[in-house]
Amino acid sequence: MKRILLKLSGEALAGEKHTGFDEATVTVVAKQVKQLVDAGTEVGIVIGGGNFWRGRTSETIDRTKADQIGMLATVMNCIYVSEIFRSVGMKTAVLTPFECGSMTKLFSKDRANKYFAHSMVVFFAGGTGHPYFSTDTATVLRAVEIEADEILLAKAIDGVYDSDPKTNPNAKKYDEISIQEVIDKKLAVVDLTASIMCMENKMPMYVFGLNEENSIVKALNGEINGTRVTV
C-alpha cells in the first residue's frame, strides 16, 4: 500500500477568484483524491494559506504574529476542504500541532497512522506550529514523520524550470532533477530548509501542474509531464 503527502497551494483552492475558496476547484481535487483512496492509497494533505494571508509581504506586523496568522489560515483551509471531501464520500481528519478546541485533533504520528488505517484522508494543518517555518517545511516534516513514500507537489506551473517560465519564454523544464541540483541552482521548488530536509531524509518529490485534467491521479501513476525530484 502506498502512502503519499499531497501539498496544495492556497491560491490553487481559490481558482480564478485568487482569494477565499472556489468550491468547483476544490470539488475537482476531492474527486481525484477519492479515486486514490478507493484504489487503496493512503493520502495526507498539507494546504498553504496564501488564499487568505501572505505574512511576509507585510511591513507593519511582527513576523511571529504574521506567521501565526498564516498558520490559522491553513487551519481554515483544511477544515473547509475536509468538508468538501466528506461531501463526495470520504472520511477525513484534521490534525494541528497546537490545540484548536474541538475543531481539530492534536497531531501525533500514532494518531495519524490510526486514521490512515481506517482509510481516512488526513489533513495536516497549522504548519509546524512555529513561526519562521513555511508550509513547504511543514510538508516535508509531516511526510518524513508519517513515512510517506513520496510528496506530490501540486503547483500553478507544470514542473521545475531553470528560470521563471512566466517571465522567460525560453525557460528549460526538467523532466528529472536531484534535490542537490535544486539546492545548488537555487531553483526554489521548495524553500531551502525543506530542500535540505528532503535530501537528508531521502524524501522524493513529484512536481506537477494542478490545472491539468485528472492531474493528481496522473501524477501518482507517473502519467503526467511533471518533474521528478530525486534524492
Q: Which residues are covered by each model-predicted region?
A:
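C-terminal catalytic "cap/lid" subdomain
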Residues: M1-V231
